[in-house]
Amino acid sequence: VAKKTIIVFSGDLDKALAAFIIANGAAAMGDEVTMFFTFWGLNILRKPEKVRTQSKKGFLQAMFGGMMPRGAGKLGLSKMNFGGMGAAMMRKVMKQHNVSSVEELIATAREQGIKMVACTMSMDVLGFKPEELIDGVEFAGVASYLGEADEANVNLFI
């Protein structure tokens, strides 16, 4: 079985779409796929609703959480976002052309057994707690990603 890894660094809608389309395509072809979400890419995995965390966050971490998009449905475009208008137009065109949303692509990834891993160091820096992320996400550090990457024949950074 061929193995693919994707580092999802970006929290932009267009890049999240690319990452999940590639991951789902590889899984559909029978490949084992691991997606490692780090820094802004973690926003894709955030639950859309505000979550009360067990432990208290520091001021800067609370600020990060408040300023960043909460979940795949709130992501902006990397170019021509225009305060969210670009992303809204993109979602409309995608719907008209029957292109799956990021949320639908995440559901497909789960169904296909794609491993989604949140970077614990990035979570610490940004102040994200495990309960703030969607179900089915694993948690690991860079050593875990590197172990997976060593065994993969394709490693992408998006």
Model-inferred region functions:
Residues I6-A16, L45-P48, V93-Q96:
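Short, glycine-rich nucleotide/cofactor-binding loops
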Residues F82-L146:
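A charged, amphipathic interaction segment
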Residues T53-G86, M90, N98:
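A glycine-rich helix N-cap at a beta->alpha junction
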Residues V51-S55, I134-V137:
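Short, hinge-like loop/turn segments at secondary-structure boundaries
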Residues V1-T5:
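Extreme N-terminal starter segment of soluble prokaryotic enzymes
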Residues L42-Q54:
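N-terminal beta-loop-helix "entrance" segment that forms/cooperates
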Residues V33-F39, V117-T120:
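Short internal beta-strands
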Residues L17-G30, M35:
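Histidine-anchored nucleotide/phosphate-binding helix
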